UniProtKB/Swiss-Prot annotation:
Protein's gene: aroK
Catalytic activity: shikimate + ATP = 3-phosphoshikimate + ADP + H(+)
Protein family according to the UniProt entry: Belongs to the shikimate kinase family.
EC number: 2.7.1.71
Protein name per the record: Shikimate kinase
Length: 190
């Protein structure tokens, strides 16, 4: 089966890695998480990179990794939440594959990430307010780059995976194994 690339974007805690890994498994494709790949290359966790190189240093590494990963063929990639901040990353993603925006509201994201110390942008006095700020800034960028938007609020991971596969099948991008899924929380982006 010929499959193009599938890229997941969204804020931290939206489920990009979990859903992306499951979609890759169902499509029998290799899966990559851009943050994990950066960590493997550097030999340290993302918070350490932020501490030593600052956010801009990390973003430089991220752009290089996004370029490398999106240049491959037949892969599923979960991007870091801030990958869409740079125009070149948005171009790599939009032009080299199908982009799925896993959208979650800031409250749900806060509940999912509040105990995670590996999220440097949330190590603030008010992480909930920070998530609301990040959502306000990034949501338009995610929508700009996305081919599909999937709301992650209520569905289970299995339902989200089926929703992604259904959208890819309807768009003629893949012919996945039989999967029935709800469609009420999916919207097509032009």
């Amino acid at each position: 089966m010929s499959v193009s690339n599938v890229f997941f974007v969204g804020l931290m805690g939206a489920g990009k890695t979990t859903v992306g890994r499951a979609v890759a498994r169902r499509l029998d494709l290799p899966f990559f998480d851009s943050d994990h790949e950066i960590e493997a290359r550097c030999g340290v966790r993302v918070p350490v990179i932020f501490e030593h190189e600052g956010e801009m240093g990390f973003r430089d590494r991220e752009t290089q990794m996004i370029d490398e990963l999106t240049a491959r063929h037949g892969v599923v990639v979960a991007t870091g939440g801030g990958a869409v901040l740079r125009p070149e990353n948005r171009a790599f993603l939009r032009e080299r594959g199908t982009v799925i925006y896993l959208r979650a509201n800031p409250h749900d994201l806060y509940l999912r990430t509040r105990h995670d110390k590996n999220r440097p942008l949330l190590q603030t006095e008010n992480p909930r307010a920070r998530l609301e700020e990040l959502h306000a800034i990034r949501d338009p960028l995610y929508r700009e780059v996305a081919h599909f938007v999937i709301e992650t609020g209520k569905p289970t991971v299995a339902q989200l995976v089926n929703m992604v596969l259904m959208q890819l099948e309807v768009a003629g991008i893949v012919v996945p194994p039989a999967a029935s899924s709800p469609t009420s929380q999916v919207s097509r982006q032009s």
